[in-house]
């Protein structure tokens, strides 16, 4: 790819995201989503590998279908109510269509099948964008229409996402697929609280973005695409590997790390809304995700593989430390003491 193309594509991503999150009109929001889709496709397929081209094709087809559904939903609502305002989504059919469209864009169960495959075919930093930045505009549309959405439908999709995200990640050895199923599982936590506390859903997404970005950047630095490469990278980056373990445990939601905060607040809010069974169910389902986080964390800290590995050991080289990785790693581990202040704001 031409080196001048990447900044243009990144600026287009920023433009598309800004248009969608700042618009009140459905057509403008749809335009922003389309700009985002067209800007990310060259970044997915830039390696010219057949798997990358396949991933870009799958991404384009699913996002095109979802965008068409968004447009159809808004047109149906405008036909019935005369309103193009995003917050005035009052027609029941439009609400159902929009929920399906955004679920496809986010990768919520049962529309999750494309997401792990696309992430597996993308470079690590593009996978980071797909897991974080690309989810922000559709999530913003859900937040703006949260008062019109069906709580029972979202709760069902959320519990299914938490279950399948944990269950399907159990047998994975590719780091990108593990993080894809981790993303699906976290989206379940966001979706279950979205109708009852939109601010808390947004906070959960922000913290998820910080933690996932830190993990992706750490994996990119040690060039770990699968568990075997994580297993043999301790000789090259011993400190980063130890930090990676803490970041993964934070992503799993273990106290006293940052990831515990959103889960704690969500369970508390669900209990206040008299949804104790749903809170118990999603808390139990998060144990599935905990298993594969623990397995990856164990691989990142082990200093002697239990059997001979096919990968050569990577020896230490004195490269300058990455400041963004260090900042994100610190935030993804140490934010739990701010919980009282965050709870007061939410």
Curated annotation (Swiss-Prot):
Bilayer topology annotation: Multi-pass membrane protein
Keyword check for Cytoplasm: no
Gene Ontology molecular functions: NADH dehydrogenase (ubiquinone) activity
Catalytic activity: a ubiquinone + NADH + 5 H(+)(in) = a ubiquinol + NAD(+) + 4 H(+)(out)
Subcellular location: Mitochondrion inner membrane
Major localization class: mitochondrion
Assigned keywords, A-Z: Electron transport, Membrane, Mitochondrion, Mitochondrion inner membrane, NAD, Respiratory chain, Translocase, Transmembrane, Transmembrane helix, Transport, Ubiquinone
EC number annotated for this UniProt entry: 7.1.1.2
Annotated transmembrane regions: 1-21, 25-45, 60-80, 95-115, 124-144, 149-169, 178-195, 200-219, 242-262, 274-294, 326-346
GO cellular component term, pick one: mitochondrial inner membrane
Keyword Electron transport: yes
Highest taxon above the source species: Eukaryota
InterPro entries in alphabetical order: Complex_I_Subunit_2, NADH_DH_su2_C, NADH_UbQ_OxRdtase_chain2, ND/Mrp_TM
GO biological process, one term: mitochondrial electron transport, NADH to ubiquinone
Family: Belongs to the complex I subunit 2 family.
PANTHER family found in the cross-reference section: NADH-UBIQUINONE OXIDOREDUCTASE CHAIN 2 (PTHR46552:SF1)
Function: Core subunit of the mitochondrial membrane respiratory chain NADH dehydrogenase (Complex I) that is believed to belong to the minimal assembly required for catalysis. Complex I functions in the transfer of electrons from NADH to the respiratory chain. The immediate electron acceptor for the enzyme is believed to be ubiquinone.
Protein name per UniProt: NADH-ubiquinone oxidoreductase chain 2
Gene from which the chain derives: MT-ND2
